[in-house]
From Swiss-Prot:
Pfam family membership, one: AIRS
UniProt keyword list: ATP-binding, Kinase, Magnesium, Metal-binding, Nucleotide-binding, Selenium, Selenocysteine, Transferase
Catalytic activity: hydrogenselenide + ATP + H2O = selenophosphate + AMP + phosphate + 2 H(+)
Family, per entry: Belongs to the selenophosphate synthase 1 family. Class I subfamily.
Manner of cofactor binding, per the entry note: Binds 1 Mg(2+) ion per monomer.
Residues binding ATP, per UniProt: K10, L36, G37, D38, D55, D78, G126, H127, T128
Protein name: Selenide, water dikinase
Its biological purpose: Synthesizes selenophosphate from selenide and ATP.
Length: 335
């Protein structure tokens, strides 16, 4: 029904910049602590940080309940990527084809709401339209302390980058859409294909709130902030989102490791995806944390003790450059 699935349907970042250029001025954003260019907008009101974001996308799986969970995971992630763990509610946007049975749409909503409940929040309203193809997402509002806000702009020279989920779900989900007539082109045993699909669903429905809470737990134990900047890895790939961090922090980032779901490099090559060049689109990807080097081992240990993936994927190597690049001998680490 659709040709672009999940976060792969996002408008490319360069086109997005051109779209909003000249429309929203700096004066328009004078009351916003964080405006365009970050994971979410932040307004400070009476000492409280109000975090607003919206994410809507096309289906990435056939199962409507799972699609709802994935959409909720992806929509809420931008609030968590700003360092805020409390979401006060979400307004769900739903596009329904006229021929789509109501029970299918209800399953999408149920998946979205169940994910919200598991993360101590809820659907509080929304908007539904008739549309030629299904759409689901939401406008999410988080609240927290101003000092807890993390943006893409805080990277420091010498920082280490930690990623909390492996990459590759674009290629993994493309595998699930291969029809019987083309199955012979996939030189991966059925058991491995099953692993790829199940691991990908697990990752796309694992909330980034879990990693954020353990980051905050470690900071409380140490009595010090250890994350300088943070984002999540979604439609622009790890290199694209690292580039955003590099530009906003005015630093040079070098990505030395690409942790990927086992089997996805082969699939990416087959499907023409840019996974191994760091530009593969991710849906509901992990947090990318720029942390002080003296705390990286403690952070990795904290994550691993709590069943959160933790990969050291790169570092900040220079000031005043504003560019992200892959190492010449970048490691492809299959998980």
């Amino acid at each position: 029904m659709v040709t672009l699935h999940g976060u792969a349907c996002k408008l490319p970042d360069t086109e997005l910049e051109n779209l909003v250029k000249g429309i929203i001025s700096e004066d328009d954003l004078k009351h916003a602590k964080v405006g365009l260019g970050d994971d979410a907008a932040v307004v400070i009101k009476n000492g409280m940080a109000i975090v607003k974001t919206i994410d809507v996308f096309t289906p990435i799986v056939d199962d409507p309940y799972l699609q709802g969970r994935i959409a909720a995971c992806n929509s809420t992630s931008d609030v968590y990527a700003m360092g805020i763990s409390e979401i006060i509610g979400g307004l769900v946007f739903l596009g329904i084809p006229p021929e789509l049975p109501v029970p299918v749409a209800k399953k999408m909503l149920q998946g979205f709401q169940d994910f919200c409940r598991e993360n101590d929040t809820t659907i509080i309203g929304g908007h539904t339209i008739l549309n030629p193809w299904p759409l689901i997402g939401g406008s999410i509002t988080g609240v927290g302390k101003e000092e807890d806000i993390l943006t893409k702009a805080g990277c420091k020279n010498g920082d280490v980058l930690i990623l909390t989920k492996p990459l590759g779900n674009q290629s993994a989900m493309a595998l699930s859409r291969v029809t019987e007539e083309f199955e012979d082109l996939i030189d991966i045993p059925k058991e491995e294909q099953k692993y790829i699909f199940e691991k990908t669903i697990e990752l796309m429905t694992t909330s980034n709130r879990i990693a954020l809470l353990h980051l905050r737990e470690l900071e409380n134990e140490l009595g010090e902030k250890i994350a300088n900047a943070m984002t999540d890895v979604t439609g622009f790939g790890i290199l694209g989102h690292s580039q955003e961090m590099a530009e906003q922090s005015d630093v040079e980032i070098e990505i030395s490791c690409l942790p990927v779901i086992k089997g996805t490099p082969e699939l990416a090559s087959l499907f023409g995806h840019a996974l191994c060049s760091g530009k593969g689109a991710e849906t509901a990807g992990g947090l990318l944390i720029s942390t002080k080097p003296e705390y990286k081992d403690k952070l990795i240990q904290k994550f691993k003790e709590n069943n959160v993936y933790a990969f050291e994927v790169g570092k900040i190597v220079n000031n005043g450059v504003g560019i992200a690049k892959l190492s010449e001998n970048v490691e492809i680490l299959e998980i």
